From Swiss-Prot:
This is Probable cell surface fusion protein HVO_0405. The lineage of its organism: Archaea, Methanobacteriati, Methanobacteriota, Stenosarchaea group, Halobacteria. GO terms for biological process: iron-sulfur cluster assembly. HVO_0405 may be the result of a fusion of two genes, one encoding an ArtA substrate and the second encoding a protein containing a NifU-like domain. As a result of the fusion, the tripartite structure recognized by ArtA is closer to the center of the protein than to the C-terminus. However, despite this atypical localization of the PGF motif, HVO_0405 is indeed processed by ArtA. The N-terminal region contains several LVIVD repeat domains, which are often found in proteins that localize to the cell surface. The C-terminal region contains a NifU-like domain, originally discovered in proteins involved in nitrogen fixation. Keywords: Cell membrane, Membrane, Repeat, Secreted, Signal, Transmembrane, Transmembrane helix.
Amino acid sequence: MDRRQFLRTVGASALAVSTAAVVGSRPATAHPGPFEPLGRIDIDGAKEAVVSADGETVFVAATSGYAVVDISAPERQELLAERRDPLSDREDGPFRGLYDAKLDGDTLLVVGPANPIPGAPAGVLVVDVSDPATPEEIAFHETEFPIHNCFAADGRAYLTANDGDRNPLVVLDIDSGDELGRWSVVDADDRWADVPPSMRSVHDVWVHDRVAHVALWDAGTWLVDLSDPASPWVLGAVSPGDPEEIAALTPRGRNRERRTPPGNHHYVATDDAGDLLGVGVESWAIEVDRDDGTTELVGGPSGVELWDVTDPANPERRSTIEPPASPDPTLGGVWTTAHNFDFRDDRLYTSWYRGGVKRHDVSDPTDPVELAWWRDPERASFWTAQYAYPFADEGVFVASSRGVGDASPALYTFPDHAGDQRDPPTLRAEPTTEPLVNTPTPTPSPSGNETAASASETESSTSTTDAPGFGLGVGAAALGVAGWLVRVTSGATESDRRSRPRASTGTPHRVVPASNLSRTTEIAFLSPAGASGEPFHSNPWGSKHRSMSDESESLKERVETWMVGQMPIIQMHGGNSVVRKADAESGEVVVELGGACAGCGISNITAQNIQSDLIMTFDEITDVQVKVPSSGDHGSSTVEGGRGGELQYGDEGPGHF
């Protein structure tokens, strides 16, 4: 078939009240009666869900543990088992930050932490689930890297290993824990070594007939034959990008590239035959200041691309299923971008965070047909959708939600038929007729790396909507441990915002209310005085800043450059810590730690959040720790000074400016 190109267009309209299809798919004739969930069961911390071979049992990764649910009666789900705080008998336990689980026969793999947790165990928990009601933990294979996602097949575990360097895919023997092999995109083309690891994070993997389909964010998706894991063989790549162009981007350009399409390969899966590959693209819009003083949003949520990989060396895109529209498509807004999905026969089951879940007929991948769509944006933010099993003349699929606000995370069951949702809600926050997302005509800069419209990029501060969870992170306000919130307004009152003091050199200071651990924190670091110049001031709650001197701009750029090189697991989800003040004259730098996937932004911050404690370490820059007491009293954070929060800058190496 001829390769088809699809142009994305995102407008101001929120989710339509009708079931009109979005660009890239068309609606089918509705099934009689409304399309709605058959049932739901609350599961604290719910993230990924996987279904047993008989379709009657669902295993849910639940952040602080895992749960087993019987769905043989889909209207009356039953919790068979729930295990919290595994490995709590270890000195560094418990095992936590658990976002992914996979099945290989009667063996369940639970992996983590999804994002680095200092001093906590990382690895693969092997669980015998031959009796789902009494899961038996039989082994723990420790790793030196966090594991955000994995795949299990034929006695092997395929692990994402974002080590901040080569970011390989690592293959383990499930029984012994021995490493069988590893592969990195740097092995395929050493030019990728010049690209910051955050731009080529290994986010997820799908294996079919021992061919690994590896999602590598802006490095695209690579198909690697791992029949012999010790000798990987690249078969082809989907939209791999140009490593030289990506390496040449400025820090601002890299930040923009990480958040907005194209690129952003997040999740991959194939159909039963392995010939049709789905690539889930996760992206957002960013607000850019134009030269004329106006602002606009560039980018927006992305969808699921369908690729013919019958010939892996020459993949062909057949179509793109576009995402639901969002009233605020920024990182801190209302997420409707693609997340995890599942193929079964000629059907595709997709999740779209607060955009809901959908069911498509993809028997003709050039013309996918939307069969059903259900959403509840005030209560549900869907992490995955998975086919379960046939019953009667229909069937069942399941979807896990991380919850929204006070609504609990949960596992939903849905009928496997076409239909319309009765009185579907919209995602519209405020009535508007103005477009929310535009794509300005690029005007190449002299370097070719930025456009005239991107002179400065800011995050909107008008919404208090919580963001979801990585999915690089510890968690946005009410959406659990996986939030990517960069807005300081979330969850804080105006009096909170006005009263937050800054940490300074010397003694510890209270720095931020933290009744919710995903709240944004602000720390001011003091460095030796630099060249004189006008301070850079930006209202930390979102107002515009005034001009910076060249010296202060240079200092800010150096801080940003260093931050970009840290925590790839956060960066790959577009998380962003913001340098809110950089004063070369006084040497003061204020960094707003936005809630990227790890709830702490892109700097050398590692976070630990198990509903009880948060530790963020700035060792490489300042020897300062920010801690929330683990007693459960999360009213404040404390800065404990090693060098008193001193920032050194020069050319001494990482962490120095």
